[in-house]
Amino acid sequence: MRNIKMPKRVLQGVVISSKADKTVTVKVERKFKHPIYKKFVKVSKKYAAHDSENKYQEGDKVSIIESRPISKTKTWIVVNGE
C-alpha cells in the first residue's frame, strides 16, 4: 500500500497580535448560509501561527498553512503576506 499524503489546509486571515516572539495570532473569517434560516452568518476563529522572522505586524493579510505541532497551541505556519 502506498503512503499518500493529504494536501495541507491553507487559510487566509488578518494578523491581530504579534506581541509574542516568533508567533502571530491570525483571525480567519468565514461566511456560510445557515441551513434553516437561510441567512448568511459570519464566523471568525483565531489561530496561533509560527512567524520565524518576526516580519508580520498587526493588520497584515497573511496566508497560513497547516503543519506539524510546533508548540502546545501552534500548528500553523505563516507562508506569505500582502
Swiss-Prot record:
Alphabetized UniProt keyword annotations: Ribonucleoprotein, Ribosomal protein, RNA-binding, rRNA-binding
Domain of life: Bacteria
Metal-binding keyword on record: no
Keyword DNA-binding: no
Gene Ontology cellular-component terms listed: cytosolic small ribosomal subunit
Disulfide bonds: none
InterPro entries per the UniProt record, alphabetical: NA-bd_OB-fold, Ribosomal_uS17, Ribosomal_uS17_bact/chlr, Ribosomal_uS17_CS
CDD domains: Ribosomal_uS17
BP GO terms, sorted: translation
A GO MF term: rRNA binding
Assembly behavior: Part of the 30S ribosomal subunit.
Family indicated by similarity: Belongs to the universal ribosomal protein uS17 family.
Matches recorded under NCBIfam families: PRK05610.1, uS17_bact
Primary role: One of the primary rRNA binding proteins, it binds specifically to the 5'-end of 16S ribosomal RNA.
Protein's name according to its UniProt entry: Small ribosomal subunit protein uS17
Protein source organism: Rickettsia africae (strain ESF-5)
Taxonomy of the source species: Bacteria, Pseudomonadati, Pseudomonadota, Alphaproteobacteria, Rickettsiales
